[in-house]
């Protein structure tokens, strides 16, 4: 039976804490609850075990699909998957080694050097990185709304707290660009704990900011000031932090023809009857533009495993192998909106899922 949690709302607590277990509904054989975490009597994925996975709301649907399939093939293994956001997931994952910490974490961006340092300081020295595939960060609007076309400069100028180092005065899109409609700026997007927020900063806001040569020069002369000017988002209500529940974000945007939303491509792909993509820099996201990375919001997504747990839980190794089998072109995850890697990158990801080589910190520099 499945032990995969429904995607919790934005205020849901971690299932890794006792006080939140009653807030999340799971279906689970009683025997699995009593199984010893470190038992490996059968020496493989069939061993009674429990895998705990946290992290990105973007990667959540893909990992959930793999977990469902994996549990059907391995009834002795139960899998918990919780959507916490990338940043919160990394914090939990890197908190230490042992039964009360996650075995894996989903991420809609690559792990940061600072996060890997936290892992190491807490005894997590074998962080295994598996690239899942490619996703596209998208800006969406209701399918009933008048289609919008934005540049990254427009988006940055609308959302920045101090666009190009100046006070934010724009109330409507027309204030940003005379060619845009005179509707109030209202964008629903990810909170700071989300990897999608990091991607919004890096892929959209920084690029829009650096369309001004002075901002590129600022990066060289004062990187801290550049980061503040280019990525700090206004807090006057024009940008609304919508939590980690992307399905709820889709519902809110589809009900408001004047609102835009920021989320991963897979949620757009699953809800084309409700929302459409906003054209950015003359491009709309699709499988082709994301695969070849020509779409400005294209990004790799990941799952990370804790190498220290594999001996006690050999099911982790088998779970990653199952994940790798499902990510290929024409595979089950493609039908759920995952954009597979091109052949060379796919082969490298498959090799990593087999080798399980710990991440080299130097590769993050």
Mark where each language-model region is.
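Flexible loop/hinge segments at secondary-structure junctions
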Residues: 38-365
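Short, low-complexity disordered leader/linker segments with a strong preference
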Residues: 1-50, 363-364
């Amino acid at each position: 039976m499945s032990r995969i949690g429904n995607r919790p709302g934005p205020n849901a607590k971690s299932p890794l804490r006792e006080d939140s277990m009653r807030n999340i509904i799971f279906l689970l054989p009683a025997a699995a609850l009593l199984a010893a975490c470190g038992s490996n009597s059968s020496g493989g994925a069939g061993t009674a075990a429990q895998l705990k996975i946290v992290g990105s709301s973007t990667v959540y649907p893909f990992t959930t699909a793999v977990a469902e399939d994996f549990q059907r093939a391995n009834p002795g293994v139960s899998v918990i998957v919780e959507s916490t956001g990338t940043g919160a997931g990394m914090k939990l994952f890197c908190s230490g080694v042992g039964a009360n910490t996650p075995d894996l974490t989903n991420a809609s961006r690559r792990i940061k050097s600072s996060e890997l340092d936290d892992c190491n300081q807490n005894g997590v020295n074998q962080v295994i990185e598996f690239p899942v595939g490619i996703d596209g960060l998208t800006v969406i609007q209701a399918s009933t709304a008048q289609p919008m076309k934005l540049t990254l400069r427009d988006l940055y100028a609308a959302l920045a707290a101090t666009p190009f180092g100046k006070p934010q005065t724009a109330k409507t899109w027309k204030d940003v660009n005379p060619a845009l409609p005179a509707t109030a700026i209202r964008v629903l997007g990810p909170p700071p704990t989300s990897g999608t927020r990091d991607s919004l900063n890096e892929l959209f806001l920084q690029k829009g900011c650096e369309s001004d040569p002075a901002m590129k020069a600022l990066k060289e002369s004062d990187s801290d000031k550049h980061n503040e000017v280019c990525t700090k988002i206004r807090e006057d209500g024009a940008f609304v932090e919508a939590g980690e529940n992307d399905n709820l974000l889709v519902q809110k945007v589809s009900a408001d023809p004047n609102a835009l939303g920021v989320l991963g491509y897979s949620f757009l792909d699953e809800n084309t009857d409700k929302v459409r993509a906003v054209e950015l820099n003359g491009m709309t996201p699709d499988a082709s533009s994301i695969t070849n990375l020509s779409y400005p919001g294209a990004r790799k997504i990941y799952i990370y495993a804790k190498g220290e747990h594999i001996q006690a839980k050999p099911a982790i190794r088998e779970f990653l192998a199952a994940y790798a089998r499902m990510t290929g072109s024409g595979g089950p995850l493609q039908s759920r909106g995952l954009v597979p890697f091109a052949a060379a990158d796919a082969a490298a990801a498959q090799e990593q899922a087999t080798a399980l080589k710990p991440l080299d910190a130097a590769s993050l520099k």
